[in-house]
Structures are given as C-alpha cells and as structure tokens.
Amino acid sequence: MKKMICFLIAAISLGTISGVSANTIKLPTPNLPGKTSLKTALEKRCTKRTFSSRDLSELDISNLLWAAYGINRPNGKRTVPVARGIYAIEMYVALSDGVYYHQLGDNILKKVTSADMRADSDSRKMGAKAPLVLVMVADKNAFDGKGDHYIAMEAGAIMQNIYLFCAANNFNTVVCGSFKRDLWSKALKLPANKYVILTQIVGNQR
C-alpha cells in the first residue's frame, strides 16, 4: 500500500511539473551574430508580407525579443527610448500552440492562452502562415492616462528595432495596426487599462 501511495504521489508530482513545463519556455541567453553593419541593415530594412512556415529557433526568438525591447545596460534600461523613464509596453509572443507573455527579467515565455491567435494579428490574416507574431500590449495608466503620444513613440521604437533585426538576420516582417483589439484583450485576459497597440509578424524568408 505504501509503495502504491508513493507511486501515486510521484506520478502526480511529475504531472504537475510537466504541466508547468509545457506552459513555460525558458529562452536561451540572447547572442546576436553581429555580422551585419548598421548601414547594411538600414539598406535592407523593408516590409515583406510572405513567410516560410518554418519555426524560428528559441535562440532566434530570444535574440528578437532582446533587440525589440531588451535590457542593454546594467541599470535596467532597454533598447528603446522612453519618456520619463517609464516603460509602458509589455511583449507577448503568438506561436502555433498559443500566446505567451515575455517575462523580461528571467527571459521566460509564460503561456496565457492555448488559442492560435496568429491569424488574428491583422485584417488580412497574413499571420496565419507565419511562425510567430509579436504582440505589443500598452498600459493606459502608465502616464496617468495622459501619455498616448509617449506610448505611441515607444511602440514605434520597438517596431523599428524589430525591422532592423529582421533585416540584419534575413527574416521577413510586417507591422500591423488593423486587428480586433477586443478579441485580443479577451484572449490575453487583459485588465481594462491595457490594450494591444501593435502586432508584428516575423518569419523566415520563403
């Protein structure tokens, strides 16, 4: 009987651990190749709306998130300029198996929904065939409700970082502003003060 109880406890424990593991992805430390000059990246920067369905590696995703909005200094400052030192945006990653919140400090992706939302990233459903969509979630309360222009500036800086990263690393990308915000808010279980400001589709070249 004792052996059976121990076995059941172990099985339950393993199941719990597996459940957590299945909903959490620990990304590797960012390690950008650094072979492309800024001049070349700027020359290649463009919008491309076709994507290979081939998945990005976890290192690719980690590098992409770091370039977009990562911490680049010991004082915690990031790769984008912001007003008053306030970071008003959070990053989510939409993959085929669901949407994940990027926990920046630990570089962890935490699943918030198992729904495949990629096709809902834009009105033309371009994201349906792409492996990944970055989702920028803004906080209306970041500047006491009076900082919409600051938030837009921050989102624009993130968007351009993504474009330059993709140009330098031979990925295709397109930023999208036309999508059903209410649908995203419901899927991500966002509080009333938060909303999706932009989505950006990223994928390998075809």
What are these regions (language model features)?
Residues 20-130:
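N-terminal amphipathic, basic helical "cap/leader" segment at the start of enzyme domains
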Residues 45, 64, 91, 132-186:
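Small-aliphatic-rich amphipathic alpha-helix that forms the alpha element of a beta-alpha
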Residues 7-16:
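Bacterial N-terminal signal peptides
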Residues 100, 108, 143, 182, ...:
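Flexible, glycine-rich phosphate/dinucleotide-binding loops
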Residues 129-131, 193-194:
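Short coil/turn connectors at secondary-structure junctions
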Residues 31, 136-140, 204:
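Short, small-residue-rich loop/turn micro-motifs
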Residues 190-206:
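A glycine-rich helix N-cap at a beta->alpha junction
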Residues 1-4:
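Positively charged n-region of N-terminal signal peptides that target proteins for export
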